[in-house]
Every structure is written in C-alpha cells, then in structure tokens.
C-alpha cells in the first residue's frame, strides 16, 4: 500500500514532465504555420486517433471516374502535428487521378485492388512510369507532377500516405481552368491556344 | 525546327538548375545522418521508385504468429531522403506484433484484412486502444510504445507508413530479453523477477 | 546629441525588424505542435531564462530510491521554442531510473556525483552499457530504451539535457502496469505471464 | 608576448570546437539527401561565397523571350548546406517565365527593372496575381504553380531567392510535352486533346 | 452542364483537403515558436503576398550613412510560415552596415547599385571579405558576424534575403553600447577599456 | 528450441529494418551539411557514446582566467547526427568567458560550482543578466551575444549543452582582433577608434 502511494506520487511527478506526445487539432482555432492548436490532453479519446472514412470507395460517378478521399488534419484531427496524413484513391474503369502535385509532402502509394499506371516527372524532365499490381508500392517525391490511371478493366483502389499532416493537393487542370485566371494569362504561360483554354474553362467552370 | 532548338537549349539550361528531387540510396556507401549518398540521377530507373515485397503475406509460422515486412531505405532505396517508408503487417489467428516503438517516426496504419486491436500508451501513461476493421486508419505518435493484435479468428493484415525513411523498430521483448543485457540489470530496471527474466531470455535466445 | 537622436531612430527602426529570438511560453494558452504561444517580449524578464529547481536533490524516498526533476517547457517556460530542456537525476544507494524512453529527443547525461551505470539498447538490439564517474558524459539516441542505476554505495546525481523543449518521458513499467491497459493485452504483447502482470499492476496501482 | 601566447593557445583550443559554419560543396562527390559533401575548410576562399553570374541579363533570344539564370548549389557551391539559393529572371518584351513550380522551396521575387505580372494558384484553386514595379517584392509559397510575364513594353528583370540550396524547377510545358511521356497519358491526365498534345510535343521536342 | 456539376463537386471535395499552402500572419494574435497564427484563407488577398516598401531608398541621413529596410513577417505578413524574408540596404557614400549577426538565418545579398565591400568572420576566426559590383551575389552563413560597407564614391544598394521569416538582427555596437548593460560587464567581456565603452555608450544612448 | 529458432529468425528479419538509431562520426571522411558519415554499426562500441574529457577543469592559466572544453562532434564522435553537444566552462577567480555567440544552437547552462554572472542581449537590444548559483540553469537563445563571468572569489564551473552536434563558437574579440581583418574595416564597422583596435590586435595576435 505504502509502496503504491510512493510509486503513484512518483508517477504523477514524472507525468508532469510528459506533454505533447500528440496534438489533436482544435479545428475551431486559427491555424499556425506548424498546424492547429491542440485540444487539451484530458479531452483526447482513443477514437481521436482513428479515421473511418477510408473504408468504403469514394464516389466515382464523375468526369474522371475516380475519387480522392482525404484524411488530412482537417478531416482527421488526431494527426495534427504528427507529420503524416493519408488518403484513399478509387478508380473506376477508365478512371484517372489527373496530373497533380502535393506542394508540401512526398507520397507513398500502396495498391489495394486492380491495376494502376502511375508516374511522375522530375525537375530534370525525366519520366518515371510504372504499372502496379495490388501490394506494390510506389513513392512520389515531394512537389513533382504525378498521376494515377486505372490500367485494368475493373475498379482499382489505393491508399496513399504523405509525410505532412497538410500535404496540399494542386490539380493541374483545376489550377489552370477552374478559376478566374484570365484566359490570356493561361495561354501566355502554357502555350496552349485560347480555344483549348476556353473550352476547358467551360467544362471545368472557370471564368475569365 | 529553329524553335525547337531554342527551346531545347532553354530546356537544358534550366534543367541544369534542377537537382535532387530524389536521392536513390547507394547502399554500398557509408550512411550520413541524413541518409545514404545518392546514386547518380542518370542511373535512376522508374523501378527504383517501386517496391514489390509487400504484395504477399510475410511468414507467420513463428512464435508470434505474425510478420513485419519492412520497406525502409535499406530495402527500398528509392525512398532514401524522401522522409517516408512503409511496411506490411501480417497477423495469423492469435498473431501479435508485440509491444514496440519506432524511435524516429510517427506511424499511420491502414487495415487491409481482418480485425486488429491496436493501441498505444502516452508519456502521460494514458492508454488508447481501438479495434479496427478493414479500411480504418489509426495513427501512432512518434516514439510511443504500441502494439497490434489479431482481434478476429481469421488472418489480418495492414499496411503501415512512417514519416522517416529509417523509422527504426525497437521490440520491447527483444530489447530486454534477446541480447546480452545482464539479468541483474533487466531485473533492476524493470522490476520483473529474475526467474521471469531468465525464462524469457531462454526463449528469446538472450544471454547474461 | 543630434548623433544620438539619429542613432536612436536607427536603433528603433532596426529593432522593429527583430522579433522572436525567444518565445517564453504562455502556459495558459493552448499548445501548438511547435510549442506554447509566446508571452509578449515586453513582459519577458531575465528571470524567465533561469530555472532554480535543479539545485537540490529530488526526494528519493520511494520504491526506486531515485528522483527525476524535470525542467521542460511546462516547468521552465523560458525554453519554449528553443529546442532544449533539462532535468536532474538523483539516485540514492540502490536507486534506479527504470527502463524508459524519451519519444521526442536525444539526451546527454553529465554525472555530478557518485557512480552511475547507464545503458541503452539499439533498434538492432545491441546493448551499450557503461559505468560513469563524475564529469563523464554519455549520450542516448532519440527514442531508445535506456536506464540509469546507482553503481556505488553513496548517492549519485546527474544533469541531463534534451534537444527538445518537450522530450516526453515514457517509463516502461508505468506504461505496462500503472494504467488500465487490460492484463490480457499486456500478456499478449509482452509474453509476460498473467501472474507477473497482475502482481506489478498491484504494486503500481494499475487496473484491468 | 606571454599574454599573446596564452591567448593564441586559447584561440586554437576554442577554434577546434568550431566547425561547419558552412559547407562549400565538393561537386565531384556523390550528393546526400542534405546536399553535397563539404570541401575542407582550409581550401575555402572568400570567392567561394560570391557568385558573379547574375550580373548580366540571360539570353532571351528564344521562344519564351525570357531567361532564368540559376545560382543553385550546382552553380554556386558556397551555398551548399546553407538553405538558400538565388536566380535571375530576364524578360524581353513579350517574355514569359511559363507556369512552373519549385518542388522544394518558397520563393521571394524582387523586381529589378521593368514591369512584371506575376501570380500563383493555391491548392484551394484561388488565383493571386499582381503586376509589380521595380523594388516591389512578391512571395510564392512552396510547390505551387506560378508564372512571371513581362507586363511592359521594355525589358524586365528580377532577382529571386529560394529557401533551399536545391529548390528544383519544374516547368509545366516541359514536364508535359518535352519528354517521352506518351501522348495517351498526357491526354488522359490533363484532358487536353491529342492534337494539342502532339503539336506541343512537336514544338518542344517531345516524343511518344 | 452535368459534367460541370460533377467536376465542381469533385473540385470542392478535393479542395477541402487543401489547406495551409500559406499562413498570412494575424499580427494581433500572440506569436508561436513557428510564427504568427494565420488569418483565414478567405480573407487573404493577392496584395498580401506583395510588399512595396523596398522600392525606394531608406533614409541614410544618420551616423552610419546607411539604412536597413526590413520586410520580415512583422512588416510583410504574407511570408509568415514560408521560411523566407527580405530587406533592402542603402549605403550613402561612406555608409556602413555595422558588424552584425542574424541569429536565425543565412543571408544572400544581391548588389543593386554601387560597390559594396562585404565580409564575414567564421567560427574558426577566418576572414572572408570581397568587394562586390552590381549583380554580384554573396552568401553569409547563419549567425556569423558580418558587415557591408560602401566601397565607392556614390550611393550603393542591395537586396538581401534570409531563410527565415524572422531572421533577427543583432547589431554589435547596439548590443554592447546602446542599452543598460553595465560598463563593467562590457569591459570585462570585451577587453575594451572603460573610457572607450563609456564614450560609445554616450554616443549610442546607452546607460550603466 | 524450435521456438527459439523461429524467434531468432524473426529477430533478424526485423533487425534488418532497423538502422541509424545513431551515426558515430567517421572523422576521416568529408563532412556533409548534416554531419560526418557514420562508421559501420558493427564497429560501434559502448565507449563511443561516452566522453571523459569534461571531468577535470580546463587550464585557466591564461588571459581570461577561464577555459572552455568542448565535446562537440569533432571531439565526441558518438553524438554526430544526434543534434546535441556539450562543453565544460571553468572560471578561475576573475575569470570570464568573453562575449560570444553560437551561430547554430541554443544553449542550456548548469552551474556546477561557484557563482557565475551570465547574460545575453536580444535582437531587440534588451539585456538579460543573472547571477547564478550551483544547480541553477540558464538558457541562451540561438545566435545571440552572451557571456559568463565569475561572480565569486573562488573558482566556478558549469556544464553547457547545445541543441546541435556542431554549435559553432564565435568569440567577439577573436573575430574582431585576432585575425587579418584590416584595422580600417574593424574601425569602420564597430566605431571603435584605430588605436583601440590596433592595441587589441597586438594583444590577440591579429594583423592588418
């Protein structure tokens, strides 16, 4: 009994020293450059470290026949400050995750089902493309343009992980054609012709 | 034609500026604190960014009925310097990945098949345990003791990702019982009795 | 006089550019992944950078005959954001700092008095143990299990420093036996027998 | 005299402790993830910290009427390991630095001469465009698509700085059209039509 | 039309995943060790990424015949969290930026006009001095004492960039002579004689 | 027996995954920006993690009546890559560690014996000075000018720790007066008079 008391006092003394193993995001507070402020440890529950939204395929009934379901800090507050996030890719037949970058993270992709042709282009303009089967892993270096495309006739899926809780996602077509960036500037900075730009702006809801 | 030449010269000029998007490890060279030296970009192939060793279950015919198949920089040189690595967990019925830590990385686990009870203990000594189904994700903060255990009657498997190309892996039982750490020191620093320590040293091949 | 005015105006102009040499923690505000928000520089005093709690031995009248007195950001707000913290170890005769890890930092130990046997186990399961005299220094790599034990007949003490303002401290026995982690899970993940686990839970105040 | 000797011995003693303020690159040695190995401090000269290649405009007689002159680690070995690099932009009338990213760095641009319309697109697809005059500064967050275009009738120039010694440079058109990335993959991942892709591949020297 | 709707829903779904490309500082909120909290992305405007205060020379009518105009996070909130800042140096004839350090950043200097003699001293006490012309670049490693001095007969100017949004600026003479550091301590720690110290304290407005 | 074999095979399998908990410096190889290349783990011994050079006072028979004994990576290769280093300060009566900076690290000081007046000056030119007794700790933010002076009549000593294996050490007087920096430049950048500069150059062995 006495031993227990001694030990417990030791325990509490030492525990005082132990903070911030984790920092579950308080999404209502303003972000900082290092992520969201933490909720108090006393309010943290085991379920804060679990995310259940990647268990079912995303809705691929769309123009790209594909879906990206993110589990970044905004969706999965438990990984705030831990330097990791994840997402699920679903590719229906003919599905494609269009050319895109993650400005703040490298990515590891693990194929769950189907066959996926994935690739990236380096700063030196070299092309690295591979067709992957379930269980194969591919790594995409930070910030480089890359894509994933269904290489088979059935659905394909993958889980991807990033070394940032907020990797960002910049889809090339959206960046060029789905906003108010003036057609003249798109033409001038991509060498595409105005007709092509205007057509894609039309499809993607862009203006200007 | 002239245009092409102009552009190509521009291309080569600009490409000179572009180095080290990646650093595929030269495993024959001495490591540095930041990882292995890189092989020359000209020798890098698309296959360097793909790892195929996680597609099949590891051998679980062992005392823990489980297997960890790592894809760290030493196995998957393409992720050297990119701040990420991955591994596959296989848990036969009654399988368990024993209590362990990764000294240098946080971890995200995605359940592929079966049901897994996973948990970790914080510095403040709080316990966070959850039983996960396929598609569920759990995050384990850096350096904390954690475990995974098959919660079902069939096999289970998961893919895990770390935010380091060299996360390390310290298995508690091996650290305590599978080396030459003297029994007296193990007893003195864990409060286990000598009989228990010696028995486990026997099972795990430890000495001292 | 005129010179002074010119210089002072220069001084104030330049000083505007100079912020956040330090970030004394406002412990009342929610933490962020990078530490606590700062109090305003105007409220910072010289005494904020001094900690006086390590000058006297901690209370070693307990089951481990030892004490750890931390000076982490929570106790010593002046080192918030500076990437360093410190602590004092006191070991009465037979005293031991049990097997533990710091999830977020490497550690340097400097022996003040007495003789200390210290050691750590690597990810590769190698054992590094040394007995140290006053003035000797030992370094413990981040996140690895390590311990310190009084190697002499008189009291021993040491000052330790970490390269994080919040290194964390996970004591193995407390993580396993001093909380609600179910006996079944402890047994399953450590290969200890239930009797041993229950006994240590009893001593350390654990449940389950 | 005696004082000098004492002091000099102190000096040398202390200087031994002082290494690696800088790490001038040995470009002949294999890179590491943190940069090139250093040449010995004894071989370092003041001129290693100076780069003279940005003093004159780059050659803008090309299809983009523009030039980027980099001073990255490969051109300016003195900034290896220091986390900074720089470059000069020259834009003849109608000149444009086409849509591009720097995968590993944020960028600050300072306009030297002329008028430049610069902009970037965020992950959230928002457009930030401004027309800048000499002396104005614009910052481009890491990894996002951005561009610079001559907004006047005379030549324009700028100096840009990156917070990496190897920021990388990925020019969108080159990544899509100036390599062997198959037309089918470009079409599939960008929604451009094959005719457009083939035409630009022709202009830019791409194949496939 | 339907396509557009599908795509837009995709767009918004994906955009949810995209946060914190940037973190424009809310200067009214308490700083954190990683910088200021961010204003909400919806309030961010293109002008937040532009700073116009470096376009005109600073006022050099002062004792040093020189001016430093900073664009650090406090002046240019758009670069908060981006790891970069910039400043302008103006040196009238005989102007000098006195011996100083930036405790938290390395620096790249680009000469705009005139001729500047710049130099730094390493930890190993070596001196690296060069006289620079317009367009020449010099790099100053983090934390080392350095200076810039007008080497010509006309005005000189430069733009400098730091790899921190808050590099700090410690001017040697101000640190020693323009505050309340007691003369006795200055004498004792610099080997200057008290007369010199008191004289400079007088000129620079110091006390003690 | 069979169990042991199974476990051992598991052990070796898992151990393969575990690298670079530490990186004991190979001082004969060229440094990299992240530190020295590592010696092979198989050659690492427990004594590599111990440094014995701080146990006895440094020689204070010199002009400053003080000594700094460093245990940086060059002296203590075991802490290469671990982000920490340490040193011992000895101050005879009237001893002083003159005004200096560590360009690459913050510092924690723990007083061992005697009484020490220590202080630093911030970028904002504020002075933070305290007189410390044994057991008191003071923290010095990265890169700022600071000093330690014996405040008592007997010897004093302290152990200091840095959050870098290579913190650097720039002593103000040596940087200004103990090298070839021309008197004219020292005068011009410090406002000291030439007589003072020449005198100190004479004492400290400087030229120019």
Curated annotation (Swiss-Prot), chains A, B, C, D, E, F:
Gene3D superfamilies per the UniProt record, alphabetical: Jelly Rolls
Residues with glycosylation annotation: 59
Main location: secreted
Other facts: Is the most highly expressed of the GLP genes.
Organism expressing this protein natively: Arabidopsis thaliana
Subcellular location, record wording: Secreted, Extracellular space, Apoplast
Protein family according to the UniProt entry: Belongs to the germin family.
GO molecular function, one term: manganese ion binding
Cleaved signal peptide residues: 1-18
Underlying gene: GLP1
Protein name: Germin-like protein subfamily 3 member 1
CDD domains noted in UniProt: cupin_OxOx
């Amino acid at each position: 009994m006495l031993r227990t008391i001694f030990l417990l006092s030791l325990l509490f003394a030492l525990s005082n020293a132990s903070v911030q193993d984790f920092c579950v995001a308080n999404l209502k507070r303003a972000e900082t450059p290092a992520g969201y402020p933490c909720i108090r440890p006393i309010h943290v529950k085991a379920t804060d470290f679990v995310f259940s939204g990647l268990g079912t395929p995303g809705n691929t009934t769309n123009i790209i026949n594909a879906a990206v379901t993110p589990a970044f800090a905004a969706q999965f507050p438990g990984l705030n400050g831990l330097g990791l996030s994840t997402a699920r890719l679903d590719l229906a037949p003919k599905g494609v995750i269009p050319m895109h970058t993650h400005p703040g993270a490298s990515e590891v992709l693990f194929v769950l089902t189907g066959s996926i042709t994935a690739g990236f282009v380096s700063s030196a303009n070299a092309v690295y493309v591979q067709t992957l089967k379930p269980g194969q892993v591919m790594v995409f270096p930070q910030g480089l343009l890359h894509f994933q495309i269904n290489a088979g006739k059935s659905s394909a899926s993958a889980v991807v992980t990033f070394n940032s809780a907020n990797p960002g996602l910049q889809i090339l077509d959206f960046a060029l054609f789905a906003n108010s960036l003036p057609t003249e500037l798109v033409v001038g900075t991509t060498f595409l012709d105005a007709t092509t730009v205007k057509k894609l702006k039309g499809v993607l809801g862009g203006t200007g």
